[in-house]
């Protein structure tokens, strides 16, 4: 620790440390390895103290400032929303048509350059380019649902790669954005980056994780539902016969949930 008239400098040194091994299906490094996490709560300019991230409210306030600076133009995709919902039998079908259209037609490409790593792209840009990152895809899903008359909101969430929750007010807490839909007293979470997740299904990487939901000047903290293991099963039904010393048979394999998504991504 070194000090001068204006600053205090903390220097951490680590030497002769082996590289961290990578193992399939292991938790993220923040679960496994000793590390330092710097939480910038405030700073002072002369006698004035300026807050940064001392609470989840501070974190949300900054995220909201980014969202408020966006210039969404729903007129660009209003006709597409009308087309997707015109022949729907009910509200659930309208929601599914919009959600699945985003999954099928918007290609996921990550953007992490400067403020673009935190600020969603305007929805009309994602719609016209037909690609975006999780933030842009979440925003397009939200705006298309709003155009259709639904209460849809942006969400910030950390995947199961990250050990922290929002009790730690830091930009290190989350690495993903999704969309929340409020309908008949229930919340549904829509992740356009999960190409093969059906409406009401949640990827294993976000199940049980704390989620920060926009709510005007306030925010809502909730958790993504954890689904029963049986929703992700792979079932095999195999019958064999021996016909003149030749083995013959029929195989039926049924994939559900995450196993279905993995199969579809592979083939």
Set out the residue ranges of the language-model regions.
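Flexible loop/turn segments at secondary-structure boundaries
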Residues: 20-21, 105-109, 119-120, 159-165, ...
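Hydrophobic/aromatic-rich core segments of domains that either
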Residues: 136-225
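Short, conserved helix/loop micro-motifs enriched in His/Cys and acidic residues
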Residues: 74-79, 107-130, 160, 171
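Active-site-proximal cofactor/substrate-binding loop regions of enzyme domains
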Residues: 92-108, 121-132, 136-151
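Extracytoplasmic
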Residues: 7, 174-176, 235
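Solvent-exposed beta-strand/loop surfaces of large extracellular or lumenal domains
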Residues: 1-6, 158-163, 224-226, 266-267
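Conserved catalytic alpha/beta cores of large enzymes that bind or transform nucleotide phosphates
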Residues: 12, 211-240
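Secretory-pathway-linked proteins and extracytosolic
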Residues: 1-111, 242-245, 249-266
